[in-house]
Amino acid sequence: QRTTGRDALRTNILAARAISEMIKTTYGPKGMDKMLVDALGDVTITNDGATILDKAEIQHPAAKMLVQVAKSQDSEVGDGTKRAVILAGELLKYAEELLDKNIHPTVIISGYRMAMEEALKILDQMAEPIDLNNEELLRKVARTSLTSKAVHDAREFFADIAVKAVKQVVEKRGDKNYVDLDNIQIIKKYGGALLDSMLVYGIVLDKEVVHPGMPRRVENAKIVLLDAPLEIEKPEIDAEIRINDPEQLEKFLQQEEEILMKMVDKIASVGANVVVCQKGIDEVAQHFLAKKGILAVRRVKRSDLEKLERATGGRIVSNIEDLTPEDLGYAALVEERKVGEDKMVFIEGCKNPRSVSIVIRGGLERLVDEAERSIRDALSAVADALRDGKVIPGGGAAEIELAKHIRRLATRVGGKEQLAIEAFAKALEGLAVTLVENAGLDPIDMVMKLRAAHEREDGKYLSIDLATGDLVNMREKGVIEPVSILANAIKAGTEAATIIMR
């Protein structure tokens, strides 16, 4: 069935709002979780906006746009996906009311754009500086991100891990902080409790030591990072060797052994006592390494090898002949440990590692998966705060403050755009209303309370304590978030709403 004109626009708005309404109930610290069952019967229980929209099989093109908004928000800042989607839904809800009053979509879009620019300007003025040394404030940022997650009860513990991990991998580039979260390795292992999770100042390899005769623990490790096989590879051309008598075979095998022996001798001669190899290690080479007391791990992922390079200060070597003592990495301890059902190799105690690992434990498979999503959001929040160098109050305080300023802008703008700008202010309030509704409080009462509070001199940090319904200062309560999460959500939500209205 083909729809055109206003009917098509209304259908698109309806579809996009359906997605927004679906996400709304999961928003905020009192938000619910969703259980998603796919075609194969696999169950995912999550509160994470990006995951919900990724797993939901959505067909409608307008609704798909909101899914893309969530994905772009997730890849850009790593958190605040629900906020972008809910804001887009609210903007479309009020746009529909304006369309009913015969206001043209172009006028609405123009008003929304003006309001968005004003909001971003005010947001920048509201923001407070934060730096690397203010660890307590960074912890508050991580804690705020974890408040609405399944790991809520262990949020102090995980916030601490997130801050320590990000501080370890942050780099100064000019006067900016640069954080590459790929340098933080996250490993999930079922078993134990959430509080058994740990931060390792080094790298954890999900591998075993290759030979039973090798040491399981090496202190003051000098590590070779090898991107070449410790085995004799077959030639690329189809060659064959014809052997006429047993002596020739004996010599042939002896020659192979000598080549491998030379490789191992070269490794031992530079003072190495640990080998981490990306390719295979021949059984004969394993035997020689074990005799020399060298611990070896094989078939390690390239990405893990690169992280090890950053953690240990070593260099990846592609040819054993070129190996020198300067190429070796250093770690205080390399040890094989049993974690859950599996054995893993811990390389830790590295000097000032630029790459670290977080091992997440938990009794339930789904809990560990959700804990991983939560810790990624917390890491992103801390990284964003350091990148921006600015933070704002959370808990709906910033949204209410922005709505107040945008209403003032509406009074200064003539024409029908004024109505669209007011609608934008209502949509921003809609984010705070959703928090309040999900906590089971009366939204109308609370919004009136908040509007009045924000007119006061000291009002910009005030929002509702969702447990009691009282007004509290979010900054003093430690509810703080990076400015980029809200700024990006406003940009992405407004763009999505305007594209759908076009």
Swiss-Prot record:
Record key words, sorted: ATP-binding, Chaperone, Nucleotide-binding
GO MF terms held by the record: ATP binding; ATP hydrolysis activity; ATP-dependent protein folding chaperone; unfolded protein binding
InterPro entries recorded: Chaperone_TCP-1, Chaperonin_TCP-1_CS, Cpn60/GroEL/TCP-1, GroEL-like_apical_dom_sf, GROEL-like_equatorial_sf, TCP-1-like_intermed_sf, TCP-1_chaperonin, thermosome_alpha
SUPFAM superfamilies named in the record: GroEL apical domain-like, GroEL equatorial domain-like, GroEL-intermediate domain like
A matching Pfam family: Cpn60_TCP1
Domain of life of the organism encoding this protein: Archaea
Entry function: Molecular chaperone; binds unfolded polypeptides in vitro, and has a weak ATPase activity.
Subunit structure: Forms a Heterooligomeric complex of two stacked eight-membered rings.
Family named by the database record: Belongs to the TCP-1 chaperonin family.
PANTHER family hit by this protein: CHAPERONIN (PTHR11353)
Descriptive protein name: Thermosome subunit beta
Organism: Desulfurococcus mucosus
